[in-house]
Amino acid sequence: AEKTELFVFSDAAKKEADAAKVQEIREYVGTVQGFANVSLIVRKENYGLARNVIEGVTEIVNRYGRVIVLEDDLVTNRYFLRFMNDGLDRYEKEKQVTGVTGFSFLDDRTDYDSESYLCGLTGTSWSWATWADRWSYFDAEALGWEKLKTDTAYRRRFNYDNTYNFYQLLKMQKQDEKTNSWAIRWYWTNFKRDGYI
């Protein structure tokens, strides 16, 4: 981590009652050590999760050509950064690979050796990485999602062989003003481009 720059995008509190907690976290970030540099980007107004992530990822990936993203409540393995950077290096020229994640929907498997990688249709919003050229396709409007309404085979594939109802999440994103997920739109972007994570 000592060669890695850390950027923390701290959203403003949604409710005034939470402002002290947000400030406490911001002060804590100021004590974080072990990185080449720690930058705290303080939002003056509440962006909400989707806007904060989208704008933060866009800023960093456009500046550095790649980005590793973590949610704020994770504890990583000591090899996490190496794994993610190795994945970014290994698959950079494989344009069908749209991102890297250390998460898998598979059960814990002991029959994979330490050099194995699995390419799936989706990763997770918890921790992931991508490149600027892949992120440039991010479709905030989720254009073409209507095909999922009528094409059951397409919807089944989008739903990971109906193991999880991603379609419902995307439908809520498009039809419900309360739902505002960057992650389902990123998955849709990658899915319709036949991308793997």
List PLM regions with ranges.
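An acidic/histidine-cluster motif and surrounding catalytic segment
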Residues: 1-69, 74-197
